[in-house]
Every structure is written in structure tokens, then in C-alpha cells.
């Protein structure tokens, strides 16, 4: 199991740009361990608007990359705001290609030279994450220090896939060096379990996987993606800069149009039954910072309004269940409280997970057209919020909220207000 250390963010704090000679020798040995002749595949998650920069007019740019570097380079089309750049070559060649591509991306075109901060999102199979993190986070810490980059490994897989996003930020040369080392690390480890590569046509605003589907900070001149803490102590990802609408084959967020086929049914979700009241409010607005939150009894029940159960598990273990079996049948709201022992957010206190069941006809008032409302609630609360699809024959949807107690209460308050404002109902 991945350790809590993966949730820490280490940055290089040295300011003089110099390191002891023995450290430099160690770093060089670390770099030279690569098998540079081995052909590997790199997949980078891009905004759709940047596909044109990679492809070029009439395919000029991508043809030049293929010819000049004798590599396989492709950016398949998609109907959403994301595309996947795929490069197959040896690691050194991949590095040279990335150095050519990064300055052409829309966010960085206005910079001269290579002295600017950038970000790339690498896709890896979920079973390879442990090889990047290392024992007690030692490997990812070493990577950050040796390459002078910021690395964030997202915990949630991309929609309907086994891929996870590794977000790498820093100077272009440093980011490329870090990616090359990661490619070597993962090429040494076989993939375990089934493999379902991410198809960007299935992107989903309600997944918190590190993609380009949340509100971006549009300020230029600095890398985005590390401003807040989110699920499990990870830094929260930036929201969407792209202007592309959702693909018409996907459901829209007002629940007015059909989706492209049902997603794979999540295991462990059947059998929950019982009527659920629809006129009970979410918990009250958050108290002043430092004030007491609602008390939970041994069954995780604040007062008598909620029917739930206490989950004594690490938040990472809870998240690894797909989704966690947290509820029992009964009347009233299903509510759970998961203690995230040892995992802390910037606002203080442990990272915990709460789930609330709502009538599915109220989901549109929370999500909004194109996911705008749910994005805003995530942004304002700092919490990770995921809305599950309703089970077949069910009239309910489950909202999973992860964060500190303050973040969760803020999110609940904003969700409640959104329903009141846009549906005229109160749940």
C-alpha cells in the first residue's frame, strides 16, 4: 500500500544553485543508470487547444518531429477538452522531443528562452505508482531534490481507466529530466492487474484525477496546479483553461441528455436499500475557525438525523475501495465519517471522507451546466467532491467529500446553498 509520505510536497529549498560535490556525483550516477537504447512509450495529457501547436498547420510540426527524431508521435482526436500526446522512442529522444514541444504550448509561447516554469501531466498505470513513490516516499523525495521539480501523483484514476496523472512542475529542462528518470523507473516494473488506458472522450468533470476539467488560475508567469490542498493531503489541481464544451455523447450536467453507455458498474455497491427522506438538510454552516464541529457518536452519527457507520480506516485505504462500502440501508440520510489517521491538510486536522446521499433529480442543481457549479464549490471549499452515478433502479446519487473538517463543512454548506438557489428545494 502506498504510504502517507506520498502526500507530502517536497521542494528544493536551496537558493544558491549549488550542491556539494558528492551530491552531484550521486545525482549523475542516478541519471546514468538509464538504459538509453530501450524503446519506451510516453503519454502526456494535454489540453485539446494545444493539439494544434503540436500538430502544426497541415501536420507540419508533427511530421517534422517524426522525421527529425525517427520517433512515433501522435495526438489522437477527442471530443473533449483533453487529448493524449503519445511518443514512442528511447528516453533521450523523448526528452529532446519534449524540449521542442513545451515552448510551443499556448501557456508558454510568450516566453523567450527556456527560463520559465512549466507543467506536464504524465499518465502511468496505477500499479506503477509505488515504484515512483518508493519506500516511505524516499524515491519521490529523491526525484524532487535531484531534478529540482515539484511532483504530484494524483490518487484517483482517470475516468473509466487504470491510469493516474503525475503532475511535474519546474523549469522545462528539469521537468524533462524528471520525466526521463520516471520512464526508466516504470520501464523496470511490469504492470500488475488489468490495463485500461485513459480515453479522453470519457473525461468527466466529477472526477478529481488531475486533468483539465477544473477551474484554472489564468495568471501567466507561474506554474498552476499547486495552490491548495485537496484529497488525502495532496495539492489540489487547477481547474480548466480550455474552452471546449463537453462531448455531446456524454451526459450534460443538467441531466438532460443521455450518456454514452453506462460506465462499468462499481463493485460493492449493490444491496443498499431503504427509503431515504428528502427533506433533511445537510449539516449546518461551518462554525468560526477553531470552533467545535458537530460531535459524532460511535456509529458516526451526528445527533439523530443521520444513519451511518464509523469507518476506522486510513483515508488511502478508503479511497482504494471502488467505492467504499460505507452505508447500511435505512431511512434518512446515509452518512459516513472516515478518519484519515496521519494525513493532514494545510488548514490543520486530519483528512477525512464524508458521503451524503441526495435525490438524483437534485444533482443538476449542484453540478450545473458544463460542471461549472461543482467546479466553483470545489474551488471555494478546497475539498475534493465526487458525485457517483445513480445505481440502476435507484433514485439517489452519492456525493463523496474529502478534506479537512473545515473544508468538508464549507463544501456541505455550499452544496446546500446551491440546491436551495437552483432547484427551489431543500434537502
UniProtKB/Swiss-Prot annotation:
Entry keyword Transmembrane: no
Stretches the record annotates as 2 X 6 AA approximate repeats: 218-302
UniProt-annotated stretches for the region RNA-binding RGG-box: 209-246
Composition bias, Basic and acidic residues: 16-34, 249-258, 295-305
Region described as 2 X 22 AA approximate repeats: 51-385
InterPro entries xrefs: KH_dom (IPR004087), KH_dom_type_1 (IPR004088), KH_dom_type_1_sf (IPR036612), ROK_N (IPR012987)
UniProt subcellular location: Cytoplasm; Nucleus, Nucleoplasm
Protein name, per record: Heterogeneous nuclear ribonucleoprotein K
Annotated source species: Gallus gallus (Chicken)
Gene it is expressed from: HNRNPK
Amino acid at each position: 500500500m502506498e504510504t502517507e509520505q506520498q502526500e507530502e510536497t517536497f521542494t528544493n529549498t536551496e537558493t544558491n544553485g549549488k550542491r556539494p560535490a558528492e551530491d552531484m556525483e550521486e545525482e549523475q550516477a542516478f541519471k546514468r543508470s538509464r538504459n538509453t537504447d530501450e524503446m519506451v512509450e510516453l503519454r502526456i495529457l494535454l489540453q485539446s487547444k494545444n493539439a494544434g501547436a503540436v500538430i502544426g498547420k497541415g501536420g507540419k510540426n508533427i511530421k517534422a518531429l517524426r522525421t527529425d527524431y525517427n520517433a512515433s508521435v501522435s495526438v489522437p482526436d477527442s471530443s473533449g477538452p483533453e487529448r493524449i500526446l503519445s511518443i514512442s522512442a528511447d528516453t533521450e529522444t523523448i526528452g529532446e522531443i519534449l524540449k521542442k514541444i513545451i515552448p510551443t504550448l499556448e501557456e508558454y509561447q510568450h516566453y523567450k528562452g527556456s527560463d520559465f516554469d512549466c507543467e506536464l501531466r504524465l499518465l502511468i498505470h496505477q500499479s506503477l505508482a509505488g515504484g515512483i513513490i518508493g519506500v516511505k516516499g524516499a524515491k519521490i523525495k529523491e526525484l524532487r531534490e535531484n531534478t529540482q521539480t515539484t511532483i504530484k501523483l494524483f490518487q484517483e484514476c482517470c475516468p473509466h481507466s487504470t491510469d493516474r496523472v503525475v503532475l511535474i512542475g519546474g523549469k522545462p529542462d528539469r521537468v524533462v529530466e524528471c520525466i526521463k528518470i520516471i520512464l526508466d523507473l516504470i520501464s523496470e516494473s511490469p504492470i500488475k492487474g488489468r490495463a485500461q488506458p485513459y480515453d479522453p472522450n470519457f473525461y468527466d468533470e466529477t472526477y478529481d484525477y488531475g486533468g483539465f476539467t477544473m477551474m484554472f488560475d489564468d495568471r501567466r508567469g507561474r506554474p498552476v496546479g499547486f495552490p491548495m490542498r485537496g484529497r488525502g493531503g495532496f495539492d489540489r489541481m487547477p481547474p480548466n483553461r480550455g474552452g471546449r464544451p463537453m462531448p455531446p455523447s456524454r451526459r450534460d450536467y443538467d441531466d438532460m441528455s443521455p450518456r454514452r453507455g453506462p460506465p462499468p458498474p462499481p463493485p460493492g455497491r449493490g444491496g443498499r436499500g431503504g427509503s431515504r427522506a428528502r427533506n433533511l438538510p445537510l449539516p449546518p454552516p461551518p462554525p468560526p475557525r477553531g470552533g467545535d464541529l458537530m460531535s459524532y457518536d460511535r456509529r458516526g452519527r451526528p445527533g439523530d438525523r443521520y444513519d451511518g457507520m464509523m469507518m476506522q480506516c486510513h483515508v488511502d485505504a478508503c479511497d482504494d475501495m471502488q467505492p467504499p462500502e460505507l452505508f447500511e440501508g435505512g431511512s434518512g440520510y446515509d452518512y459516513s465519517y472516515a478518519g484519515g489517521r496521519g494525513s493532514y491538510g494545510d488548514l490543520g486536522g486530519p483528512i477525512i471522507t464524508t458521503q451524503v446521499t441526495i435525490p438524483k433529480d437534485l444533482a443538476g442543481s449542484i453540478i450545473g451546466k458544463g460542471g461549472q457549479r461543482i467546479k466553483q464549490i470545489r474551488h471555494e471549499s478546497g475539498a475534493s467532491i465526487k458525485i457517483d452515478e445513480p445505481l440502476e433502479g435507484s433514485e439517489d446519487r452519492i456525493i463523496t467529500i474529502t478534506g479537512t473538517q473545515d473544508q468538508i463543512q464549507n463544501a456541505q454548506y455550499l452544496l446546500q446553498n446551491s440546491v436551495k438557489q437552483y432547484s427551489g428545494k431543500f434537502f
